[in-house]
C-alpha cells in the first residue's frame, strides 16, 4: 500500500474499501445493536476493535480508522446530532455572512482526542505491514454541512452564500482549511501513515466554481500533511474536476465510477497515484459479475505503478459479504 502511494513497483495491486467496516457486516450490526454511531466513534477501544476485526476478516491492505467526517465541527461550535434514519443534523446552521463569525478556530484538539486514541489503538492492533489511514472532510464538504444543516440534493444555501457573500465564504473556508490541516497532522502524529481528504459534495460544482471557491482551501488543508505522508484526495460526482483535484494536491487521487480508470489517470496525470474505482452497486450482483468487473478495472490500470484498488464510494449496506471477499480475492489473484 505504501509503495503504491509512492508509485513504486509492487508485486500486486493493494486493495482496501471505503466503509469496509459497515452495516453489510453482521459483526458490525451486532455492535451497533448495543451502541449508537457516535458512541461507537467516541469509544476508542470499540472503534479500533471494529476495524481490526474487519481487516482480519477481509484481508485488506489498509485500515482506515472508524470515525466520521463531522466531529471536527463540534469543538468549532456546531450543534451536531446524528439521528436515526435522518443522518447528521446541525441545529445551528450558518446561513448568513454574520453567522460565519460563530465558527470558532480549532486551536487545540483536546475535544477530538478520542480520534487520536482510535488511531493509536488501531495501529497497536495491526501487523506493521498494514498502514492506518486517518481522514477528514474537505473544507467544501464541511462548509456545506455547516450551511445546509445536513445533507442536501441541491446545495442551494451553500451556493447562495458562496455567490452572494464571497468574502464571508472565503473566511469560512479559511477557518475550516486551517482546522482540517491541524486535524490531519494530529492523526499522523498519533500513528496514521496515510490520510485521506473526503470531498463528498464537491461534485455539485462546475470546474470554474471549484477553481475559484474551493481549490485554494483544499490545497491549504492538505499542504502540511503532504509534507509528512501520502495524502489521498477523493471527491465524487463530477469527473471534470479531476485535473483540478490534482492541482489542489494529494499524492493519490481517488476516482469514482463515473469515468473509466484509464481516462481518469490520464486526466489526473501520471505523476500521481490513483485509487478506485469499481461501482459499489456491482457488489450487489453475483460473484461472477464481481470478478469480471474487478478484472476490467485492473486492466484499465494497465499495470502502471500507483494503482490502489477501491470502490468509487463506500460499501453499500445490503452488500453480500461473499461478494466483498470475492473482490478482494480477485485483486490479490487468489
What function would you assign to each model-found segment?
Residues 1-78, 82-84, 291, 299, ...:
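N-terminal basic, low-complexity leaders that serve as flexible interaction/assembly modules and, when applicable
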Residues 4-20, 60-90, 110-154:
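Glycine-rich, aromatic-flanked loop segments that form ligand/cofactor-binding clefts
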Residues 29-41, 97-108, 246:
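Short, basic, glycine/proline-bearing loop/turn elements
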Residues 34, 86-101, 155-156:
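Active-site gating loops and adjacent loop-to-helix segments of metal-dependent hydrolytic enzymes
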Residues 44-45, 109-112, 170:
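Generic detection of long, well-ordered alpha-helical segments
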Residues 62-84, 94-95, 99-108, 192-210, ...:
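Glycine-rich, proline-tolerant flexible connector loops at the mouths of alpha/beta enzymes
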Residues 113-334:
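Active-site loop segments of alpha/beta catalytic cores
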